[in-house]
């Protein structure tokens, strides 16, 4: 069995990766356009752009599979540009493959450059020249999370496909299908928790599903155990102790327990707080949500710049205690009787 075959047996993300364009989830318009290339046996250079886990690399492999069949890897050079990002790789590996002779009955070869937005500027300039020189025998597929990092001369030579975030119902439907195939017990809340923590990244969602399934059942508790995050209920308790109870010391103790128990960084806490302030479980005026969101952004910036986690998060809790004062006063106010 090949290394990829062994990997597919171990990792569900590989085992259930779509092999053909018709199996790809959600990206209907993109799939239709790519299927035209398959039908015509011709295509331009391509740039696949979009967030992680939306099917960019899968679509590239599926396109090659539908063009060449099961042995498509014989006619494709795949490189991860984040590891092999320098000009030397472009001048050696890529150039040698691009100019090599075409096999019989193959219209063109494919060079797949994953994470192409991590290539150096010099490497991109060299790549641009290769794309011009060998267009008769080789097509390039570039994959990027941040297409703005790809130089304009390359972008102008490519047909750009923008992959969108996967819909919640599509991700959950796929996870349910995998659970059914693997005879895994799951509940809807557990699958929704996977979607939330994976942020629409299908590959990440499937990996979390497999890890949670190893604990026996895919439920909310097991999902948060395997990802090493606090549960939404714990984050809401932290918010309530500061906002609605005004108890700074209790909130700080809760914060420390979460950071120790789960090994959370300050940025992890900020991200979870940001998600929960917009939860329907937290009842507060819209203006207050906006003000808290703005302050969370400021605290995150400080943390990324190297500020101390505990000091910044303590400052955040103090801010929440102050912001929550009108809510506490309103809750304590007794209605006056009308005579």
Question: Language-model features: where?
Answer:
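P-loop/Walker A NTP-binding region and its immediately flanking N-terminal helices
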Residues: 1-160, 170, 296, 300, ...
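Short loop-to-helix capping motifs
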Residues: 27, 200-201
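Conserved ATP-binding/catalytic motifs of P-loop helicase motor domains
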Residues: 234
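Conserved AAA+ ATPase core "coupling" helix
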Residues: 91, 151-196, 205-208
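C-terminal helical "lid" of AAA+/P-loop NTPase domains
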Residues: 111, 191-197, 203-217, 224-225, ...
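Helix-rich C-terminal "collar"/helical-bundle subdomain used as an assembly and partner-interaction module
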Residues: 238-339
């Amino acid at each position: 069995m090949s290394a990829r075959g062994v990997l597919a047996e171990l990792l569900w993300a590989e085992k259930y990766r779509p092999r053909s364009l018709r199996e790809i989830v959600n990206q209907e318009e993109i799939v239709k356009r790519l299927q035209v290339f398959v039908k015509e046996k011709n295509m331009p250079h391509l740039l696949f752009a979009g967030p992680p886990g939306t099917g960019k690399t899968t679509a590239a492999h599926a396109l090659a599979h539908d063009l060449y069949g099961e042995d498509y890897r014989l006619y494709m050079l795949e490189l991860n540009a984040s590891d092999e990002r320098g000009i030397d790789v472009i001048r050696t590996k890529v150039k040698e493959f691009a100019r090599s002779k075409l096999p019989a009955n193959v219209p063109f070869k494919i060079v797949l450059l994953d994470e192409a937005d991590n290539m150096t500027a010099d490497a991109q300039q060299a790549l641009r020249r290769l794309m011009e020189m060998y267009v008769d025998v080789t097509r390039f597929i570039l994959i990027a999370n941040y297409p703005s990092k790809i130089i304009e001369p390359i972008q102008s030579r490519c047909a750009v496909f923008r992959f969108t975030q996967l819909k919640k119902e599509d991700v959950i439907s796929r996870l349910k299908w995998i659970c059914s195939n693997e005879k895994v017990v799951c509940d809807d809340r557990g699958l929704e928790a996977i979607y939330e923590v994976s942020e629409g990244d299908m590959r990440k969602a499937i990996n979390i599903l497999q890890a949670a399934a190893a604990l026996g059942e895919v439920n909310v508790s097991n999902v948060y155990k395997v990802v090493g995050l606090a549960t939404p209920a714990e984050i809401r308790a932290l918010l309530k102790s500061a906002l609605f109870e005004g108890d700074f010391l209790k909130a700080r103790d809760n914060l420390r327990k979460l950071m120790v128990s789960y090994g959370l960084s300050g940025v992890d806490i900020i991200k979870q707080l940001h998600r929960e302030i917009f939860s329907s479980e937290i009842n507060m005026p819209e203006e207050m949500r906006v003000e808290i969101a703005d302050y969370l952004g400021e605290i995150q910036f400080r943390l990324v710049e190297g500020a101390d986690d505990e000091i910044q998060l303590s400052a955040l809790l103090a801010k929440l205690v102050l912001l929550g004062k009108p809510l506490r006063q309103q809750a304590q106010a007794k209605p006056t009787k009308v005579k």
